[in-house]
Amino acid sequence: MKKFLEKKLKKIAYERIDILMSLAEEEAKKGNWDRAKRYVYLARRIAMKMRIRFPKKWKRRICKKCGTFLLYGRNARVRIKSKRYPHVVITCLECGAIYRIPMIREKKEKRRKKLEERLKAKSNSQTS
């Protein structure tokens, strides 16, 4: 009974987090940055209280340093860099915090293609 109740509570918490974050997005688009920040704060508190992971789609839209909702193009700058390793750089224009998100999927695809090419070349040389 306890596990069932826990699952139900966590599901409700995820729903509330999603609602609060969508409200924060709407308020940020209107220009009410303080209200958006408050909604983000409440959503994070719910996640901490219920000890659940914050959804990834929303986690990247929050500045970890100042807690503002990041609207790309307005209060956040997004750049794609390929130095050292391919990654996306998100800069909060409120506090200047920088977040790097590696583009792992693209790197894995590149490795897979190279491996396939090597295998094809190897099989062609053996058949000749």
Swiss-Prot record:
Cellular location(s): Cytoplasm
**Cofactor: how and how many bound:** Binds 1 zinc ion per subunit.
Keywords, A to Z? Answer: Cytoplasm, Endonuclease, Hydrolase, Metal-binding, Nuclease, tRNA processing, Zinc
Known catalytic reactions: Endonucleolytic cleavage of RNA, removing 5'-extranucleotides from tRNA precursor
Q: Per the entry, which co-factors are needed?
A: Zn(2+)
Query: Which residue ranges does UniProt annotate as crossing the membrane?
Result: none
In short, the EC number is 3.1.26.5
A Gene Ontology CC term for this entry? cytoplasm
Residues binding Zn(2+): C63, C66, C92, C95
Q: What class of enzyme is it?
A: hydrolase
InterPro entries, alphabetized = RNP4, Rpr2/Snm1/Rpp21
Functional note: Part of ribonuclease P, a protein complex that generates mature tRNA molecules by cleaving their 5'-ends.
Q: Describe its assembly.
A: Consists of a catalytic RNA component and at least 4 protein subunits. Forms a subcomplex with Rnp1 which stimulates the catalytic RNA.
The family assignment reads:
Belongs to the eukaryotic/archaeal RNase P protein component 4 family.
Q: What is this protein called?
A: Ribonuclease P protein component 4
Task: Provide the species name.
Answer: Methanocaldococcus jannaschii (strain ATCC 43067 / DSM 2661 / JAL-1 / JCM 10045 / NBRC 100440)
